[in-house]
């Protein structure tokens, strides 16, 4: 982790001078400012709470960095996090990155310039060294930012197993998975691995269908309709609930008999789509744990690297 002292040593100035450059306090020559800014750039250092700690200030402000609020799971999780933070005396500042690297960089700089005490990170568009350079305490949700960053997640792998097992138990033999961004750092990757393992155990063939999360709703409808028309799947595991609802509706319109299991289990789904069988994540517990861990990190407590909460299979009401 790059520290304020490292910047000072590289620039050949005092730590106080680096802090004054960061906070724009007092008179400084252009040459000094340039030296400090170049040192920060060379070291990939992003100013944070350490710089303002010299002034003894804390705004009780936590940055929340997530891909989007369009996804109902993220929307509910963010709401629960904000509520838990408020109870603990903290306010939240939200940044949505939309899977855009530059947008994440810009928002990260904005959060740190606004002197957040810590960041709860649910997005991942940068490199490991970019996250290592951030001195502000970080707790990640479902993302492996660096080997040293604490990460909180649901048991996505077990969720994939439970979903696939439910489809097999309901009589499905030709089971597809509709998945989004399943790179190795994505939670859907582990859900897919659970699906693959359970099919292997039952000697069933795999059918992996990519449905990129960046697609518009209209694009998803068109593509999924084509897929269902051209295949005779009798079971589909969707790695998110919104896609699962879409698959169920399109299959019904096409008069196809299809068992569908989703993933997330939000209050919205439970209230408005009670007939959807899904893998339910413990959203309240996730939010409470994320808030507790980031505050403990801010307070200087030692915490573990990995925290994983169990998921449950929630059967829809026929």
UniProtKB/Swiss-Prot annotation:
| Record has Oxidoreductase as a keyword | no
Q: Does the keyword ATP-binding apply?
A: no
Molecular function (GO) terms for this protein are: DNA-binding transcription factor activity; transcription cis-regulatory region binding
Q: Which residues bind DNA?
A: 4-23
Read off the PROSITE patterns from this record: HTH_LACI_1, HTH_LACI_2
**Stretches assigned to the HTH lacI-type domain:** 1-56
Keywords (A to Z) from UniProt: DNA-binding, Repressor, Transcription, Transcription regulation
Residues in the signal sequence: none
Q: What does this protein do?
A: This protein may control the expression of the genes that are involved in the transport and catabolism of sucrose.
Q: Which named protein is this?
A: Sucrose operon repressor
Organism whose genome encodes this protein? Lactococcus lactis subsp. lactis
């Amino acid at each position: 982790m790059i520290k304020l002292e490292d910047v000072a040593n590289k620039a050949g100035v005092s730590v106080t001078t680096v802090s004054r450059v960061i906070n724009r306090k007092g008179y400084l020559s252009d040459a000094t400012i340039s030296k400090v800014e170049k040192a920060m750039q060379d070291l990939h250092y992003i100013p944070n709470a350490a710089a303002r700690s010299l002034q003894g200030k804390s705004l009780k402000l936590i940055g929340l960095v997530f891909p989007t609020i369009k996804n109902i799971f993220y929307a509910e999780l963010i709401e629960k996090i904000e509520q838990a933070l408020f109870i603990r005396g903290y306010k939240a500042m939200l940044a949505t990155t939309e899977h855009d690297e530059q947008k994440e960089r810009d928002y990260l700089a904005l959060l740190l310039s606004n002197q957040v005490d810590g960041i709860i990170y649910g997005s991942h568009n940068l490199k490991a060294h970019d996250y290592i350079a951030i001195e502000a305490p970080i707790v990640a949700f479902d993302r492996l930012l660096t080997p040293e960053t604490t990460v909180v997640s649901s048991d996505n792998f077990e969720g994939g197993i439970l979903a696939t097992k439910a489809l097999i138990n309901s009589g499905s033999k030709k089971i597809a998975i509709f998945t989004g961004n399943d790179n190795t750092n994505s939670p859907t990757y582990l859900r897919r691995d659970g699906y693959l393992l359970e099919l292997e155990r039952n000697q069933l063939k795999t059918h992996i269908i990519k449905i990129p999360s960046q697609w518009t709703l209209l694009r998803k409808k068109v593509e999924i309709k084509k897929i269902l028309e051209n295949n005779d799947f009798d079971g589909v595991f969707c790695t998110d609930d919104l896609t699962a609802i879409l698959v169920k509706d399109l299959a019904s319109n096409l008069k196809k008999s299809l068992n569908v299991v989703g993933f997330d289990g939000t209050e919205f789904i439970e209230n408005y789509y009670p007939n959807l069988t899904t893998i339910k994540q413990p959203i309240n517990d996730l939010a409470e744990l994320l808030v507790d861990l980031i505050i403990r990190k801010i307070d200087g407590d030692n915490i573990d690297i990995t925290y994983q909460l169990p998921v449950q299979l929630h059967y829809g009401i026929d």
